[in-house]
A protein has these predicted regions:
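Membrane-embedded, hydrophobic transmembrane alpha-helices
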Residues: 1-134
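Alpha-helical transmembrane segments at the extracellular/periplasmic loop-to-helix junctions
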Residues: 48-58, 283, 360-370, 385-436, ...
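Short periplasmic/luminal acceptor-recognition loop of GT-C membrane glycosyltransferases, typified by
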Residues: 498-595
């Protein structure tokens, strides 16, 4: 272990204050650089944040009291949020599969959570609830709030509470949440913006239920509840890596605050939240907490009860983002091998646990089978050398520097990697260091496989997002250990490295926010008002090229049959059917009328704003083409 200066309580308090002030300064400068100066969105952001915190906190509090290992007792409320992130959505999913409406299940889950919190405290007495470290909790909360504000920069800049970024995945997420507010997950409702959850998204019901529940609690549309829940997930990921560094890597809680700040301000965390990659973000948020609880259960510091929390988070990862599931499993297996120990459930878990898990598995059979299918497809692609792998919206290999938060090419990545190696050699407990080192070596080999084929760009991004986050946490651990070293030269080096990382992260994050603003501006959501003003039963042709904008336009026109002459094809998205026959045309304002006249569009605009225009379509006499517009979408 690296020699460090002994610290008094007051010195540790000053350390935490400095960390909070540095994060606040970073957030303020970044907000000024990106033009995020509008507070009009604040009331709705507060409503969405409170709703997400209530959902996770109430769902996870009793579990945190029951399962929290001694090492995490001082920051138990943070663990409650992490466990509630899994427990609440899973409970809603189980009840939803039984066709109980969300309007009933959400109050039921919250009341059950409150009752369970009261029961575990009453049953265990004072000794069941260890005292909290108020100073650490306040500092952790302050860092978390600041990191959340950074993730919400698109809202501060636009003054609008809506989905950020450019990834059309958000259309399917919001549509799925809106459907679950009114129907069970296997239902079809053609009058909604998304009439059916696509089969390829069949494992992700819990994370759609979470958004639907937050929307109900806050009174916001799922569009409005989306950014605050994404911000909370990003914050939980950052705090999870900080807790992992503080408790497992041996850095201490206040050193872990620095790691949390570094992780939360890194490009990967911000990019997942604002692009956004909703499914991947959920797995990413659960990853560090699963690793931490698994380590504490295996090494004996967390007792066997930590294994239950680890298993719950692994289940969430498997359903939310099946491709991530092998990563924590590989790391945990290597931990068990290094420690020469097998995971054990607590006595009460061994008595009723197997039966409970079997029942849970039977109820969740459909999403579990969808997750297994996804994993098997990915595995079959990887074992064929040179074979193609899944593609997506990443069409070129992203520079290594982005994955360690600094931007740039291989050089900054090598510096952070060197710090990570230093941490493994000098800071992290030996057996854990062996397990993590072996895991990183395996992940490096996998990256070589992905970079040997042109189609590997998308999966390489996914892979390095998870691997890089672990390297960042280890690298920050190494830098903090240098900063706290007895030798002045080492402390200066640590400070310089952290400052250089901060400058690089500031530049990269600024570029990220310039590229990702609000995906659904007011002009786009105004189409919903136009739809309500149209005569019932009339149809609309969406004359918008293939894009996420077309999908959102169809979402807002859900009350009317729609079609498109250029629908979004060859994706995992439900989309309007192909067709040219309709009563109205919705087009981009920049498209001149003369280009639309050959498609029957005529007359002055019925509705228009700065981006879109709605006009009548006049079908030529003698037309024999059948109607093509439909309320039912084409499933991928």
């Amino acid at each position: 272990m690296t020699a460090a200066r002994p610290r008094t309580r007051s010195a540790e308090g000053r350390w935490a204050v400095r960390v909070v002030l540095l994060v606040a300064g970073f957030a303020l400068v970044l907000a000024l650089l990106t033009g995020a100066r509008r507070l009009g969105a604040l009331p709705d952001l507060l409503r969405g944040s409170v709703a997400a915190l209530v959902l996770f906190g109430v769902s996870g509090d009793a579990l945190a009291v029951r399962l929290c290992p001694p090492a995490l007792q001082p920051v138990r409320p943070v663990l409650a949020l992490a466990l509630g992130m899994a427990a609440g959505p899973l409970a809603l999913t189980v009840l939803g599969i039984l066709h109980i409406p969300l309007a009933v299940t959400l109050p039921l889950v919250l009341v059950a959570g409150l009752a369970a919190s009261w029961w575990v405290r009453r049953r265990g007495g004072r000794e069941a609830v260890a005292p909290l470290d108020v100073h650490v909790l306040v500092a952790t909360a302050a860092v978390g709030v600041l990191l959340g504000c950074v993730v919400l920069i698109p809202m501060w800049g636009s003054g609008v509470v809506s989905v950020p970024g450019i990834n059309p995945d958000a259309h399917q997420v919001v549509g799925s949440a809106a459907l679950l507010q009114q129907a069970p997950p296997d239902a079809t409702r053609v009058q909604l913006g998304l009439d059916h959850i696509p089969t390829v998204w069949g494992s992700k019901w819990p994370i759609f239920y979470a958004l639907a529940a937050a929307s109900n609690l806050s009174g916001l549309d799922p569009l409005g509840a989306f950014p605050t829940m994404a911000a909370l997930l990003a914050v939980l990921a950052a705090l999870g890596f900080g807790a992992l560094a503080g408790e497992a890597f041996g850095l201490g809680r206040r050193g872990g605050l620095v790691v949390a700040a570094v992780s939360g301000l890194s490009w990967v965390t911000i990019h997942l939240a604002v692009h956004p990659y909703w499914n991947q973000l959920w797995g990413y948020a659960a990853l560090p907490w699963a690793l931490l609880l698994g380590w504490l259960a295996l090494n004996g510091r967390g007792e066997a009860r930590a294994a239950v929390g680890c298993g719950l988070l692994l289940l969430l990862i498997a359903l939310a983002y099946p491709l991530l599931f092998p990563y924590p499993v590989v790391i945990l297996v290597l931990m068990a091998v290094a420690l020469r120990r097998r995971p054990r459930l607590p006595a009460w878990g061994r008595r009723g646990g197997p039966i409970g898990f079997v029942l849970l598995g039977l109820i969740l059979l459909v999403p579990l089978l969808a997750a297994v299918q996804k994993l098997s497809q990915a595995g079959s692609q990887l074992i064929h050398p040179g074979g193609a792998v899944w593609g997506g919206d990443v069409t070129s290999f992203i520079p290594f520097g982005d994955f360690v938060g600094t931007g740039g090419g291989i050089l900054p990545a090598l510096v952070i990697l060197a710090l990570a190696v230093w941490a493994l050699v000098r800071v992290v407990p030996r057996r854990l260091a062996l397990a993590l080192g072996a895991a990183l070596a395996l992940f490096a080999l996998l990256d070589v496989r992905l970079r040997t084929v042109p189609s590997g760009t998308y999966m390489d991004f996914k892979h390095l997002a998870f691997t890089g986050s672990l390297v960042v946490a280890l690298g920050a651990t190494g830098a903090v250990s240098l900063l706290r070293h007895r030798r002045r030269e080492a402390a200066v080096l640590g400070a310089v490295l952290l400052a250089a990382w901060g400058v690089g992260a500031m530049i990269r994050d600024r570029r990220e926010f310039k590229e990702h603003w609000v995906q659904v501006p007011p002009e786009l959501s105004e189409i919903r008002d136009w739809s309500r003003a149209l005569p019932p039963g009339t149809s609309v042709r969406i004359d918008i090229p293939q894009s996420g904008v077309q999908l959102w336009a169809a979402y807002f026109l859900a009350e009317h049959p729609v079609d498109s002459i250029d629908p979004v094809l060859f994706t995992t998205y439900a989309h309007p059917p192909w067709g040219a026959i309709a009563d109205y045309s919705l087009a981009l304002r920049v498209i001149p009328l003369r280009a639309l006249r050959r498609l029957g569009v005529t007359g002055p605009p019925i509705r228009e704003n700065r981006q879109f225009v709605l006009r009548r379509i006049v079908v030529p006499p003698g037309n024999t083409l059948p109607p093509t517009a439909s309320l039912r979408q084409v499933q991928p």
